[in-house]
Amino acid sequence: MAARIAFYAPLKAPTHPTPSGDRQMARLLVRALQSAGAEVDLASDFRSYDGRGDRQQQQALQAEGRDLAAALIDGWRDLPEGRRPTAWFTYHLYHKAPDWLGPAVSAALAIPY
């Protein structure tokens, strides 16, 4: 069975409309994982970036991330085991764009992060 990888890029998703090096790297990593035989699903396009260091904005993003993680967990738990992710891959952790999804989802589904 091929690995099913939940891919997430909190700074900029590979599907983001604005070109950038981060978007290109995310796309290349997805392709590399697919070339290695993995099935890769974009877990979310949620962007947790706050460039100003605004405490209220960061708290709002954290709360939104917590809600999204809970929804992902519920959705994947409802799927047959063969359709759930077997690993979580986060590209580009950054203090201005933390991963509020991956650790919670990985722990809940007991998959590698």
Spell out what each predicted region is:
Residues L33, V105-S106:
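A generic structural signal for well-ordered alpha-helical segments
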Residues W100-A104:
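A short acidic, amphipathic alpha-helical/loop segment
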Residues R47-G51, Q59:
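Extended, alpha-helix-rich binding/interface surfaces that flank or overlap catalytic cores
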Residues H16-P17, G53-R55:
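Short acidic, glycine/proline-rich loop/turn micro-motifs
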Residues D22, G65-A69, H95:
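A conditional alpha-helix N-cap/helix-loop micro-motif detector
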Residues W76-A97, I111-P112:
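Short N-terminal targeting/anchoring amphipathic segment
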Residues Q57-D78:
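Glycine-rich, highly charged phosphate/nucleotide-binding loops
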Residues M1-S48, R83, I111:
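N-terminal subdomain of nucleotide-sugar transferases
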